[in-house]
Amino acid sequence: MDRSELAKYGTSQHPQYVRYRHERHLPPVKAAAGTARDFVESRLRAWGRTDQIEDATVIIGELFNNALLHTDSKELVAAIDWNGGRIRLEMWDDSPDRPRIAPVDFEKESGRGMYIIAALCEIWGSRLAASGKCVWVILPE
C-alpha cells in the first residue's frame, strides 16, 4: 500500500494521512507474551506487512517479558502503530524506570532482551508517562 492510498484529507501541498493504531491490554502473566505476539502478527497481516512479522513478534515478546520481569505493573499495554511508513511498537507499564542495554553475559540464559531489540530495530527509546513509561521501537522498512 502506498501513501496515496492512505490519504484521508488535506491538500496536495499539505496532505494528512491516516494513522493506524491498535492497543491490547494484557495481564502481567507469562502466558500473555503469546497474546502480545499474536496481536502484533494479526495487525501486520491485516496491513499486508508480513515481511515484518518475525522481527516484530520477537521484539514485542522481549518488551513484554522485560516489563513483566522488571516492573510490578498491574497491567501492560502493547501497541502497534503504522502511518503508511515505518511500524512502531510500544509497551506501556507502571514503572518509571527506563530500560538500558547492559553488558551482555552470553554464558547466562537471560539478560539479552534489550540487546536483541536494539539489533532488530532501527531505533528504540522510552518516554515517561503520567503513571509509568512507554518503551517504543521503530522497525526498519
Positions of PLM-derived features:
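Generic hydrophobic secondary-structure packing signal
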Residues: V29-A32, Q52, L63, K133
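Histidine-centered phosphotransfer motif of kinases
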Residues: D55-S73
